[in-house]
Amino acid sequence: MHVTLPDGKQLDLQAGATALDVARALGPRLAQDALAALVNGELMDLMTPLPEGAQVRLITKKNPGDAAPVFRHSLGHVLSQAVGEFYQRKGYPREAVKRGVGPAIENGFYQDFDLPEPLKEEDLPEIEAIMREIIGRGLDIVRQDVGKAAALKHFSYDPYKVELIQELPENEPVTFYAQGDYVDLCRGPHFPNTGKLPGAFKLMSTSGAYWRGNEKNPILQRVYGVAFATQKELDEYLERLEEARRRDHRKLGRELELFLIDPLVGKGLPMWLPNGTVLREELTRFLREQQFQRDYQGVVTPNIGNLDLFRTSGHYPYYSDSQFEPLSVDEEQYMLKPMNCPFHIRIYASKPRSYRDLPVRLAEFGTVYRYEMSGELNGLTRVRGFTQDDAHIFARPDQLKKEFLDVLDLTVLVLKTFGMNDVRFRVGVRDPASDKYVGDPAQWEVAERQIIEAVEEVGLPYTVEPGDAAFYGPKLDFVVKDVLGREWQLGTIQVDYNLPERFDLTYTGEDGQEHRPVMIHRAPFGSLERFVGILIEHYGGDFPFWLAPRQIMLIPIADRHNAYAQTLANEFKAAGLRAEVDDSNNRMNAKVRNAELHKIPVMLIVGDQEEARREVSVRERTPEGHKERKGVDFTALLAELQERYRTRA
């Protein structure tokens, strides 16, 4: 067999040769330094036989980061071995520790266990120390191919491995990887030796996880770790993680009294507290203003609908796994609304439409319900009941590009208004090899071309992702990077040829004939809950003045200044601003500290001098730090803050 190197050179090797054989053919030093290989663009370990004609690039200790998924996978095996040794040192037999799966994941690895007694967080440092012992032993990591019967016999004590092995094809070898006396069922890839694994790793946490993600299965204990090629990368990651903890929307949501999730109300069903309600209403007011300027029409639809509506749309039964069970009322079946679009379609269809009427733009802040497994729920970002800023545009095919551009412009405006300036687009188009798509291929080609043209006109970076389109039409996802460098998919625009067909939507064309409209789904926020959760973390709770639930805190120096402070607060309120007075018995410094803890952007201190001159002393929270101004005329400040609120500066 032969393989091709990055410089185009070809090597002739024996059949069944591995990447390690390639390294040996190029020299003993390279064989010593090699860690993994990129084979036909995919990561592979040094022990796996190469395919004929493969293109091979060796990864060495000079660039270990290129093999991060491989060393993270191997560290997962080291973790698994270390947990086994941890329990053996406690007197348990080797077979007492049973194992689920343990893949490499972004930034690290995890391993699932069925343990004789639960691991505690305080056990993790000891297990990490055992991992470092195993790395220090310099154990060769060896690939082994065995028959299915032998594999079942080896793991007869472990029901999880037995289940996985039984699902494998009968006549194919089962792959094990061994290091020392530890053996695991695994396809690889792995580093060649534990001694070559980086020491820049850390065990982070332990939690419960259902076997194979199914709530009907046993709960296993999952241990998470992170790993990087260098200590510098690990330290930087841990710093970012600490900053993320400080910004965690669940923590800040409690501290700033924004939302509440009460177990008696139900998991994944957030309630908005007064401060959070202000935040939510500012978001909806902003978007309603933008939609009004773009000729959207507001609608309101029920929270439940007849099951036949969702049968017609196809949401039931095709998406029934992510929906709540139907309920029976008066011999009819109803379902909690999983999506707003079928309701908007029925509004469109409620009267005849002419080509002159189109486009019809229907918008709603509509609450929908999706069944999420309890293990996937997370604060506001993964919930069971949420409100979408949903709109559906019914347009003629010749209007598609213009409407798409307008929605694109609106969504970019929304994101940039909230300081999310690092935006890229992901255009989802058909996979030419798939037959899952509905609609006329010629229409698809026009729609895909017009979406790409629209994106290019905006001038932001984009990628085209074949196969990422929905079955009913191409789509555009907005991917935003926040201040922590994390990427979020916020907002989607989807072109839909399917639902107009299913509901037999028409309009009368200029030729007097009935024609099928094209439909656009759009939601710039996606959902208010998720968007607010991301906003809280993006701003770290330090919202801009116009968005802050509590905008102004007046701080009297002494009790005799309370009346003056209240007079000013009333004038702020009359001007539409949110102001309050801290008339507690605390000292002034304590009042300032309390306002700081609640991240109130504007603090106004008033004493004898300020009252005599109708002035205030201003202390502001800004992204650059605190900004202080003494003796500011109140009337001028009121006008300044009104303008900031009006312009959302």
Swiss-Prot record:
It is an enzyme of class 6 (ligase). Residues 1-60 form the TGS domain. Its main location: cytoplasm. GO terms for biological process: threonyl-tRNA aminoacylation. Its EC number is 6.1.1.3. Pfam families: HGTP_anticodon (PF03129), TGS (PF02824), tRNA-synt_2b (PF00587), tRNA_SAD (PF07973). InterPro entries: aa-tRNA-synt_IIb, aa-tRNA-synth_II, aa-tRNA-synth_II/BPL/LPL, Anticodon-bd, Anticodon-bd_dom_sf, Beta-grasp_dom_sf, TGS, TGS-like. Binds 1 zinc ion per subunit. Its cofactor is Zn(2+). SMART domains: tRNA_SAD (SM00863). It catalyses: tRNA(Thr) + L-threonine + ATP = L-threonyl-tRNA(Thr) + AMP + diphosphate + H(+). One of its GO terms (molecular function) is ATP binding. Residues 248-544 are annotated as: Catalytic. GO terms for cellular component: cytoplasm. Keywords: Aminoacyl-tRNA synthetase, ATP-binding, Cytoplasm, Ligase, Metal-binding, Nucleotide-binding, Protein biosynthesis, RNA-binding, tRNA-binding, Zinc. Zn(2+) binds at C341, H392, H521. It is found in: Cytoplasm. Belongs to the class-II aminoacyl-tRNA synthetase family. NCBIfam families: thrS. Catalyzes the attachment of threonine to tRNA(Thr) in a two-step reaction: L-threonine is first activated by ATP to form Thr-AMP and then transferred to the acceptor end of tRNA(Thr). Also edits incorrectly charged L-seryl-tRNA(Thr). Homodimer. This is Threonine--tRNA ligase. It comes from Deinococcus geothermalis (strain DSM 11300 / CIP 105573 / AG-3a). The gene is thrS.
